[in-house]
Amino acid sequence: MTCTIEMTAQENSSSPTTAPVSPTLKPGRRYLSVIAHVSGENVQRLEEWKRAVAGGAVAPISTHVTVYLTELTESLLAAVQSSQFREVLDTPRFEARWGSVRSFRPVTEVEYLNLEAGKTEFEQIHQKLVALFGAGAASFPYVPHVTLGQGLTQEQVDHAREVFDALPAEQRTFTVDHLHCYSYDGQDWEEMRVLPLH
């Protein structure tokens, strides 16, 4: 069973402002995106901040940690559905915790929450996927993170720091118990597979 989630460009970029085009995604191409949703009570704070800054709804898929991204081919599609794929990603569930507001500038205009806990686990899963499918679409090193927005103003970044940097650890923690595989073309996310972590 597949589901397609349509999002506006604003929601898709997780951006409270009109975002520039992604430096990684090429128009007209389809990608495999393996992500972990930020779930539980603590995601509400993130979604509320995005909603307040952006106005309007924030799609649930917008708050996640990208684990791996690569251009989708027919052979890759078959590999994702295979039992080998499940075996390679046989990983225990883990706790993750976001830290302070950081930026990828000047490489790209993305502000994000770094990961204080769970970073090593995300990096290990990413490396398993690199070993299976190759380096992927990103032209820069993998940094597990939760995107706050793209093209934010300095005022918005300062506000994000006020809201997120001082939160106690229990309000920044979430459980990673599933990985979600999506086919993504820059606008629509079509769920291909959900992998429960044990």
Regions found by a protein language model. Give the residues of each.
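Basic, often amphipathic N-terminal segments
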Residues: 2-95, 103, 118-172, 189-198
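Short histidine-centered catalytic/ligand-binding loop motif
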Residues: 110-118
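Active-site/acyl-donor-binding loops of N-acyltransferases
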Residues: 182
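Portal/gating segments that form or line small-molecule/metal binding sites
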Residues: 99
